[in-house]
């Protein structure tokens, strides 16, 4: 029996509709209505350091030799011990510190400087795979062996990145998203240590090396920069989805190699400088 062109067209159209319906069923968004969401019992945001360092992907940027590694080492030791830092509670648990620019001898010297007692639940590595070669699996394996892991610090982020020249927003964002997904999967804090750009910027949070895709994909970002208020100090600028914006004035104690708090804008909001003054100081500083 001959089939007319109109019938063939109708049959073809029906097949396409069935195929598209099947595809669309698989591509539907997974959604939840507001009423159901409000009735769900969800875990509150967890913190490695209460109100300061949330679970998820965090990034700490700072100029070379300013003291980022000293700060991260102190954080990891205190989390492993369950000791407060700057009067903020820590969640006690295993800490992993990938010191990829250091040797074990240097780490030992620094530990001797900052503490009299090194806890057994802080672990160090001086080499690791790149992200494209299996870093995430290495961290997964460590957390599997140490289920109480609270923090994994990577110092520095640049060492584990892909070895290419792509510094676009899309590439930066995607790399950070991979590590954020890992932090969310393992329910830990991953803290990346990163460098700042050489050129100045009136907004400290725009100084991270690379595009804004790096800070944009992170749960929290911290910039340790030369203080605009004191000659021998530093300011830690903090911002994130689950923390309040704050500026913490710090002083480096050369005797015990620890960063000590001078003031905190969360407790004393009046110490925040107006944006115009901040921009002027930054301009003058980078002209010197």
Can you name each region flagged by the protein language model?
Residues 20-24, 30, 145-148, 185-186, ...:
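C-terminal regions of RecA-like/P-loop NTPase motor modules
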Residues 80:
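Gly/Ala-rich phosphate-binding loop of Rossmann-like dinucleotide-binding domains
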């Amino acid at each position: 029996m001959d089939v007319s062109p109109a019938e063939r067209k109708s049959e073809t159209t029906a097949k396409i509709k069935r195929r598209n319906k099947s595809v669309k069923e698989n591509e539907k968004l997974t959604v939840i209505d507001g009423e159901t969401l409000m009735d769900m019992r969800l875990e509150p945001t967890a913190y490695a350091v209460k109100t300061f360092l949330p679970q998820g992907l965090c990034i700490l940027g700072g100029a070379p030799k300013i003291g980022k590694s000293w700060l991260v080492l102190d954080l990891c030791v205190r989390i492993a011990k369950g000791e407060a830092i700057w009067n903020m509670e820590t969640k006690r648990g295993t800490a992993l510190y990938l010191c990829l620019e250091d040797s074990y001898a240097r780490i030992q010297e620094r530990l001797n400087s900052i503490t009299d007692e090194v806890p057994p639940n802080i672990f160090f590595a001086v080499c690791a795979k790149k992200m494209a070669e299996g870093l995430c699996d290495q961290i997964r394996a460590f957390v599997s062996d140490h289920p109480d892991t609270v923090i994994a610090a990577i110092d520095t982020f640049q060492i584990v990145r892909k070895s290419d020249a792509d510094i676009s927003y899309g590439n930066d964002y995607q790399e950070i998203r991979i590590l954020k997904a890992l932090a969310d999967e393992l329910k830990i804090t991953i803290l990346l240590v990163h460098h700042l750009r050489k050129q100045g910027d009136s907004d400290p949070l725009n100084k991270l090396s690379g595009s804004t895709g790096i800070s944009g994909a992170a749960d929290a970002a911290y910039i340790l920069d030369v203080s605009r208020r004191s000659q021998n100090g530093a300011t830690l600028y903090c911002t994130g989805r689950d923390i309040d914006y704050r500026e913490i004035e710090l002083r480096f104690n050369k005797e015990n190699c620890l960063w000590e708090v001078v003031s905190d804008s969360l407790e004393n909001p009046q110490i925040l400088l107006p944006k115009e003054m901040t921009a002027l100081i930054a301009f003058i500083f980078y002209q010197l």
